[in-house]
């Protein structure tokens, strides 16, 4: 990561840790008694960090990079700190000892991100269109070409990037950040501190159609989607992810849910608190996903299913039935050289026949 702060604004290590959000984390600084604590201008990896940056060690695979790091300070676990204290070849940099170094790194990254992007004053750009009855609370920033429709409300401290659309009756809680070109259809409700990346679309019609022979053989009649979308607090939604409105009830995304880019959630889907999904996941309508689940990239979930709490789906898995017990589930056919894959696929197609033959032999 490049150095983020100019030297004048760079805090000393202890001041940085005191001003960052370290709530719930125990940490201490270990440095030579006669050492002056360094000023920290940014964060870097062990390999790339310079003498004005802080780094971190969380994965034992990078232990070998520690001896050669040029970082001014390194975040390590108590066990790693003890090992370094007994290692004469250990780097002379300051050590920040914390049982959760990756989480502390995340908190410091948040601090630097906020420091390099100072909060802009509240304003409504002259090229924005805001309905007369829309409610805009204090300290809100609305960028150019935004549209805020009738009855919509924007919570205190929220920011709308250029080109965002907030549909009729939709609402944002406090301290939300919508990047450029986010679209909320009508009746979308979002809680506090949400982050929505560019291209997110919430509240488009669910894929609901009824066979309608009055329109012709094989024709479909549209089912009006009368529900909305509800998003909880502290939710982050990645670029170009779409969540459809419910048919009758709301599509519901719980507190703390994290959605990667290009995910599609169908109508009436419900996702429990603190569940995370990687890119390109597809969830068909009316499926219920529990709390604290993880779903790997490109996994596909059929409609009208239930996944219990603490279910973990590997990337690329197709889920076609309920999973009620916690645990990790994988349904990915392993890749192979193409010719070998074709031979294995041919065997798979004959499994039921081979099973019958085996049973017959066992009975003989």
Curated annotation (Swiss-Prot):
Gene Ontology annotations of biological process type: lipid A biosynthetic process
Active site positions, chain numbering: 267
Catalytic reaction annotation: a UDP-3-O-[(3R)-3-hydroxyacyl]-alpha-D-glucosamine + a (3R)-hydroxyacyl-[ACP] = a UDP-2-N,3-O-bis[(3R)-3-hydroxyacyl]-alpha-D-glucosamine + holo-[ACP] + H(+)
SUPFAM superfamilies from the UniProt entry: Trimeric LpxA-like enzymes (SSF51161)
Keyword tags: Acyltransferase, Lipid A biosynthesis, Lipid biosynthesis, Lipid metabolism, Repeat, Transferase
A Pfam short name: Hexapep
Name of the protein in question: UDP-3-O-acylglucosamine N-acyltransferase
Organism of this sequence: Bordetella petrii (strain ATCC BAA-461 / DSM 12804 / CCUG 43448)
Lineage: Bacteria, Pseudomonadati, Pseudomonadota, Betaproteobacteria, Burkholderiales
Gene: lpxD
């Amino acid at each position: 990561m490049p150095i983020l702060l100019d030297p004048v604004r760079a805090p000393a290590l202890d001041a940085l840790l005191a001003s960052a959000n370290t709530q719930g984390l125990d940490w201490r600084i270990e440095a030579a008694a006669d050492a002056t604590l360094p000023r920290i201008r940014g964060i870097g990896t062990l390999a790339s960090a310079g003498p004005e940056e802080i780094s971190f060690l969380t994965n034992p695979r990078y232990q070998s990079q520690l001896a050669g790091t040029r970082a001014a300070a390194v975040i390590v676990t108590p066990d790693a700190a003890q090992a370094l204290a007994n290692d004469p070849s250990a780097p002379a940099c300051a050590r920040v000892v914390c049982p959760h170094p990756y989480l502390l790194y995340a908190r410091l990254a948040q601090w630097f991100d906020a420091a390099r992007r100072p909060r802009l004053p509240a304003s409504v750009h002259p090229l924005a269109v805001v309905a007369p009855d829309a409610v805009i609370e204090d300290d809100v920033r609305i960028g150019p070409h935004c549209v805020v429709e009738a009855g919509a409300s924007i919570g205190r401290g929220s920011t709308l990037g250029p080109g965002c659309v907030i549909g009729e009756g939709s609402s944002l809680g406090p301290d939300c950040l919508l990047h450029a070109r986010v679209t909320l259809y009508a009746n979308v409700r979002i809680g506090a501190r949400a982050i929505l990346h560019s291209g997110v679309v919430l509240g488009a019609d669910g894929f609901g159609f009824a066979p309608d022979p009055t329109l012709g053989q094989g024709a479909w009649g549209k089912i009006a989607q009368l529900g909305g979308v509800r998003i909880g607090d502290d939710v982050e939604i990645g670029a170009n992810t779409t969540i459809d409105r419910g048919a009758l009830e709301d599509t519901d995304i719980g507190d703390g849910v994290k959605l990667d880019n290009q995910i599609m959630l169908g109508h009436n889907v419900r996702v429990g608190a603190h569940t995370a999904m990687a890119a390109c996941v597809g969830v068909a309508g009316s499926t219920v996903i529990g709390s604290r689940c993880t779903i790997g990239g490109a996994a596909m979930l059929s409609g009208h299913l239930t996944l219990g709490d603490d279910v973990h789906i590997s990337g690329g898995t197709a889920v076609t039935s309920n999973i009620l017990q916690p645990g990790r589930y994988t349904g990915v056919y392993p890749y192979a050289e193409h010719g070998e894959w074709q031979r294995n696929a041919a065997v798979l197609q004959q499994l039921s026949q081979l099973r019958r033959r085996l049973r017959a032999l066992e009975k003989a």
